[in-house]
Amino acid sequence: PKSMDDLNSFVTKEIGDVQLLFNNAGVAPAELQSIWDTKPNDWNWAYGVNVMGVVHGIQAFVPSMLAHDKDARVINTCSGNGAFINLPSTPIYTSSKAAVSSITEVLKLQLEQMQSKIKVSILFPGPHTVRTNLFSAERNRPEELARDPNAPEHPISSVEDMVEMMKTLG
């Protein structure tokens, strides 16, 4: 989108050629339900941020990184949930982070085929849940992607709650 293109123009003008692109986007909708009980707005919001945020970063910055032909790196933040394990309690978040993992691998292969100087990495924070605002991301949710008011409340409100839930997985 234009906002990412504008960011690239601003950074290039103020700092110079971009040599490090760090795509770090993540929201976790209130889930803990079966896939068939989830709502389209939950999918649209999470995929819009978690997946398309990474895609938009790549689309806005990689072409200019290729053009200046310098050593550079793209780092995409992922999650072990979706890349290494698939928690059944978070189908939307899990599948969105699996998509980020796949996008990162494809980007790496495409740039290698071009013999580009851009290297691609994936970051998996952890190995445990990192204390972030991921579980309170609803505060930034766009109104047009509002949560279903009839959906059950999210029983996980803190990292400690997540740890307790994980203990039950066996």
Give the ranges of each region predicted by the language model.
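Substrate-binding pocket helix/loop in short-chain dehydrogenase/reductase
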Residues: 32-35, 39-45
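Catalytic loop of short-chain dehydrogenase/reductase
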Residues: 75-99, 105, 109-113, 126-129, ...
